Amino acid sequence: MDHLEKIFGKTAQMTVLENLIEHQDDPTYISGIARETGLSNSIVSKVIKPLVTSGIVVERPLGKTRTFRMNIENEAANLITGFCNGINQIEV
């Protein structure tokens, strides 16, 4: 998702969002996002909260842990996902 970085800059929230979009069909954990992005668990936890609060990301308990994934039932999440996928298909 280098095109998004060129346009919006690299922020922790964009990095987490990009990771969730790349793995939108699979629920993931804070630790998995942290490992794949190079961010700390605490940073991922901090920046994912507004995405969950806004309904863009769904949080589900799984035992003592929580899983996260893009909310395919949320219009904003679908628009963001479509935009991200589309922007990567053009030259920027």
Short names for language-model regions:
Residues I21-D26:
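Short helix-capping/hinge SLiMs at alpha-helix to coil transitions
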Residues I48-K49:
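Short, hydrophobic-biased segments on the C-terminal half of alpha helices
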Residues G32-R35:
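A short acidic, leucine-rich amphipathic alpha-helix
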Residues M1-T15:
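Short alpha-helical segments that sit at the start of domains
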Residues P61-T67, E73-N74:
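Short, Lys/Arg-rich nucleic-acid/phosphate-binding segment
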Residues E75-V92:
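Amphipathic alpha-helical dimerization/coiled-coil segments
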Residues V52-L62:
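A short, conserved structural fragment
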Residues S42:
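Key DNA-contact positions within bacterial/archaeal DNA-binding proteins
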